[in-house]
């Protein structure tokens, strides 16, 4: 029995160039059109997302339906932030609070949507600012960070054009101790307590 020589790494690559090219093209297509990894650089989404978390952001679903209230989205900065020096290629991550046609107001530490107070169990602390009622225009959304008092979001720079949305943050893959699906939060209006 005769042993065939072990091919060198260069010979292996040369023989498998077509396969490697197909794999590279598929990887690039997945990254640009289907899903991509993202790194969380700030604390604006505490306690939901921590600085250093790594997420999978899917890019397909919003081509078929608009974002929903409660979705955590990744997006390019709106025009006002670009004027202030943020690069168009930079990415932000926030939670969708209101959709086109809905109103948003912040008063005495409570966020209201369409006049109803929201019960937001996922926020770090109640907002320490007020925002007069504003109606979200067509083609835009209102977004806020879960760390209400440390977030550069719609309460500062206004509405986010839906065309700026990169995708929906679905899954945290790092760190392993916080591994899992992010999902969307279903907003429940706060109960009104009537003293009798």
UniProtKB/Swiss-Prot annotation:
The keyword Transmembrane helix applies. The active site is at 44, 94. Residues 36-196 are periplasmic. GO terms for molecular function: serine-type endopeptidase activity. GO terms for cellular component: plasma membrane. GO terms for biological process: signal peptide processing. Its main location: membrane. It is a single-pass type II membrane protein. The chain crosses the membrane at residues 17-35. It is an enzyme of class 3 (hydrolase). It catalyses: Cleavage of hydrophobic, N-terminal signal or leader sequences from secreted and periplasmic proteins. InterPro entries: LexA/Signal_pep-like_sf, Pept_S26A_signal_pept_1, Pept_S26A_signal_pept_1_CS, Pept_S26A_signal_pept_1_Lys-AS, Pept_S26A_signal_pept_1_Ser-AS, Peptidase_S26. CDD domains: S26_SPase_I. The keyword Transmembrane applies. Belongs to the peptidase S26 family. This is Probable signal peptidase I-1. It comes from Synechocystis sp. (strain ATCC 27184 / PCC 6803 / Kazusa).
């Amino acid at each position: 029995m005769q042993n065939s020589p072990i091919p060198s790494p260069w010979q292996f690559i040369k023989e498998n160039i077509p396969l490697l090219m197909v794999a590279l093209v598929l990887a690039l297509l997945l990254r640009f059109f289907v899903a991509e990894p993202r790194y969380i650089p700030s604390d604006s989404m505490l306690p939901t997302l921590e600085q250093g978390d790594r997420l999978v952001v899917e890019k397909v679903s919003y081509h078929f339906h608009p974002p929903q209230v409660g979705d955590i989205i990744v997006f390019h900065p709106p025009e006002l932030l670009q004027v202030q020096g943020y690069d168009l290629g930079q990415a932000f991550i926030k939670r969708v609070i209101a959709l086109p046609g809905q109103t948003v107001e912040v008063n005495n530490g409570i966020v209201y949507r369409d006049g109803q107070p929201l019960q937001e169990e996922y926020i770090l602390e109640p907002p320490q600012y007020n925002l007069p009622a504003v109606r979200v225009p067509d083609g835009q959304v209102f977004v806020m960070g879960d760390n209400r008092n440390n977030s550069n979001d719609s309460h500062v720079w206004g509405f986010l054009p839906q065309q700026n949305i990169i995708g929906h943050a679905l899954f945290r893959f790092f760190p392993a101790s916080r591994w899992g699906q992010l999902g969307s939060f279903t907003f429940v209006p706060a109960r009104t307590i009537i003293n009798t």
